[in-house]
Amino acid sequence: MTRVVISVGGSVLVPSLDAHRLKEWAEALINLTNAGIQIFAVVGGGGEARRYIEACRDIGLDEASSDEIGIQVTRINAALLIGALKEYAYPVVAESYREAKTAAVSGKIVVMGGVTPGQTTDAVAAVLAEEVGASMMINMTAIDGIYTADPKKDAKAKRHDILSPQGLIDLIMKEKMCAGSNMVIDLVAAKITERSGIPLVVIDGRDPALIEKALLKGEFAGTIVGNSAIRFPIV
């Protein structure tokens, strides 16, 4: 069975606590499962996690402790997604890579949040893709791909259709030098992707149906990092 790890940004899964939005995501993941793809979803904390982390800093907590609380928020979001998936999901949020691999034996959708302080859920997804031998990692975020520059700030920015792992790392390093920059994926995740050789695909997560269109219908719009030989649909 084809295995796919999906990093679902909290900002696209739960921009607000909206049951309809969660059901849309659940429907998309269930349709992928029914098509014969085993899904692993790593859920981010979104704006809620950032608010908690900021509150932690305001009361004087150290960064590691603040991260731990942020991780708890990602796991709450993961639990919400499990609830929406119902019997299609493994019923417990995986809190480690070992737990995720054990849960995968069930054949159900495995959902997890953060794991380690200082590590983003994108990095968690990249490591998980290695651990479970995924054929690809998909980053579902609030933009439709990786651009030459921030499209919100540069009208001339163009979306990359295909990008090498080193090209992604170079782009992230360039952006990190600019105050307030906001890359689609972080440097650690990009380096893990380069190491593993597992292709990274970036798709606009604001519409959950787009992942179905790409994987099941071949209607792909986004950026492929790594193996340019990937062809959609994958089943």
Swiss-Prot record:
Pathway(s) where this gene product acts: Pyrimidine metabolism; CTP biosynthesis via de novo pathway; UDP from UMP (UMPK route): step 1/1
Lineage: superkingdom: Archaea
Gene3D superfamilies according to UniProt: Acetylglutamate kinase-like
Activity regulation field: Inhibited by UTP.
An example molecular function term from Gene Ontology annotations: UMP kinase activity
CDD domains membership: AAK_UMPK-PyrH-Pf (cd04253)
Signal peptide from the UniProt entry: none
Function in brief: Catalyzes the reversible phosphorylation of UMP to UDP.
Subunit structure: Homohexamer.
Family: Belongs to the UMP kinase family.
Name recorded for this polypeptide: Uridylate kinase
Protein source organism: Methanocorpusculum labreanum (strain ATCC 43576 / DSM 4855 / Z)
Gene (UniProt): pyrH
